[in-house]
């Protein structure tokens, strides 16, 4: 390997340097404190584990995004986590096994074999929160509110939210008796708003069902979409009408809490269709082609771990929030330069200063005093009259 290649990083993999790394870490601590104040408990999951665990349930969508390796000890296939949700679901279902609702949160690096979108990171710092054990819209509203509080904490400007419900399409597709292949084709066409394709795929269905499936292409816009949907989907199965009721209840609560938040409804939005079961939501900002925070309901996610539980949650990339956010992060500046000395009194003084939160940098043998400036020190420890004192560096 040529020397010039040794410092190159793979596409989508980046290192974070000072002071940006400090900003990210401070933001991480602030967000975790926010989660804790809402009653969410932190969990730490393995970076790597057996592949079948990572790709169980919600993880099936992650297959193409998961780096895979062979465990040299067992010979089994392992994967680096590409998302926390399957791991947290296992913790709730198999390890904690609580009877009541469980609120869990996480923050850590994930690794993607394929980027989420063009020019996006393959090593985001994912943070999120998940609420297990309650199937009501109240839990969805809580999780969405916590997501918005996270964006407010980092002061991300000009956010707007998209809301949908995969139960609407799923209920109509089930009533139409679509084969798996046709259901997937129609799903793809709806995501692209491909009207002609949707028309062709639903042409042979009973009139009412065909009309309702075709209506999903057009049922997008402001709050008036929900009233329109009640009319155009009025002959839909009960599960579809219940999904509309849930979506309306969530929208009402959000409008009450956040009257200035723009809400956009898209009943053909099926993000995460393979594992989401209810409401889905995402936050966008101008200039970003991808959502900056997203989530939804994924009931029964723990079934593959032996215990099905309703669940809802959200996730976001901390590095993106720090980049987009306007919140002022106050970084520690300055420090005290400690001379290279074996004096026990000096060491005791340094320990006391550090315990008080002061930053003290040890001078190494041969370093001139000018090195203190490079170490961002503005003061120094000097022995005067038999005592070590902190004085300005210029003195």
From Swiss-Prot:
Q: Does the keyword Cytoplasm apply?
A: yes
Q: Name one process (GO BP) from the record.
A: L-histidine biosynthetic process
Q: Which CDD domains match?
A: HisRS-like_core
Q: Which residues cross the membrane?
A: none
Kindly list the places in or outside the cell where this protein is found, as annotated in its UniProt entry.
Answer: Cytoplasm
Keyword line: Amino-acid biosynthesis, Cytoplasm, Histidine biosynthesis
Q: What SUPFAM superfamilies has UniProt attached to this entry? A: Class II aaRS and biotin synthetases
Primary localisation category: cytoplasm
State which pathway it belongs to. Amino-acid biosynthesis; L-histidine biosynthesis; L-histidine from 5-phospho-alpha-D-ribose 1-diphosphate: step 1/9
Question: Quick one: a GO cellular component term?
Answer: cytoplasm
Q: Tell me yes or no: is Cytoplasm among this UniProt entry's keywords.
A: yes
Q: Which InterPro entries match?
A: aa-tRNA-synth_II/BPL/LPL, HisRS-like_core, HisRS/HisZ, HisZ
Further facts: This function is generally fulfilled by the C-terminal part of HisG, which is missing in some bacteria such as this one.
Relate the protein's function as given in its record: Required for the first step of histidine biosynthesis. May allow the feedback regulation of ATP phosphoribosyltransferase activity by histidine.
- NCBIfam families, alphabetically? hisZ_biosyn_reg (TIGR00443), PRK12292.1-1 (NF008935), PRK12292.1-4 (NF008937), PRK12421.1 (NF009086)
Q: Which PANTHER family match?
A: HISTIDINE--TRNA LIGASE (PTHR11476:SF7), HISTIDYL-TRNA SYNTHETASE (PTHR11476)
Please state which protein family the record places this protein in: Belongs to the class-II aminoacyl-tRNA synthetase family. HisZ subfamily.
Assembly and partners are described as: Heteromultimer composed of HisG and HisZ subunits.
Which protein is depicted?
ATP phosphoribosyltransferase regulatory subunit
Species of the source: Pseudomonas putida (strain GB-1)
């Amino acid at each position: 390997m040529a020397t010039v290649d040794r410092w190159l990083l793979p596409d989508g993999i980046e290192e974070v340097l000072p002071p940006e790394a400090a900003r990210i870490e401070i933001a991480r601590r602030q967000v975790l404190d926010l989660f804790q104040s809402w009653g969410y408990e932190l969990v730490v999951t393995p970076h790597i584990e057996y592949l079948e665990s990572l790709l169980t349930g919600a993880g099936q969508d992650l297959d193409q995004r998961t780096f895979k390796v062979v465990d040299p000890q067992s010979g089994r296939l392992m994967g680096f986590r590409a998302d926390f949700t399957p791991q947290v679901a296992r913790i709730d279902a198999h390890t904690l096994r609580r009877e009541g609702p469980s609120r869990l949160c996480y923050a850590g690096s994930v690794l993607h074999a394929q980027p989420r979108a063009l020019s996006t990171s393959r090593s985001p710092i994912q943070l999120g929160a998940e609420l297990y054990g309650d199937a009501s819209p109240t839990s969805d509203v809580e999780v969405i509110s916590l997501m918005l509080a996270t964006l407010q904490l980092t002061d991300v400007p000009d956010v707007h939210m998209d809301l949908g419900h995969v139960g609407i399409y799923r209920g109509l597709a089930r009533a139409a008796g679509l084969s798996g292949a046709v259901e997937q084709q129609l799903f793809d066409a709806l995501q692209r708003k491909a009207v002609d394709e949707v028309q062709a795929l639903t042409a042979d269905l009973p009139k009412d069902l065909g009309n309702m499936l075709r209506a999903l292409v057009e049922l997008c816009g402001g709050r008036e979409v929900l009233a329109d949907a009640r009319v155009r989907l009025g002959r839909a199965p009960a599960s579809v009408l219940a999904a509309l009721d849930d979506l309306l209840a969530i929208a009402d609560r959000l409008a009450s809490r956040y009257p200035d938040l723009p809400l956009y409804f898209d009943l053909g939005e099926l993000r995460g269709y393979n594992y989401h079961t209810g409401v889905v939501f995402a936050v966008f900002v101008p200039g970003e082609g991808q959502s900056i925070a997203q989530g939804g309901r994924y009931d029964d996610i723990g079934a593959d771990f032996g215990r099905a539980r309703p669940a809802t949650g959200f996730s976001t990339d901390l590095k993106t929030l720090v980049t987009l956010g306007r919140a002022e992060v106050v970084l520690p500046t300055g420090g005290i330069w400690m001379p290279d000395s074996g004096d026990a009194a000096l060491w005791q003084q340094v320990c006391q200063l550090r315990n008080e939160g002061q930053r003290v940098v040890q001078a190494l043998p041969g370093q001139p005093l000018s090195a203190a400036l490079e170490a961002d020190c503005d003061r120094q420890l000097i022995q005067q009259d038999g005592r070590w004192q902190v004085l300005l560096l210029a003195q």
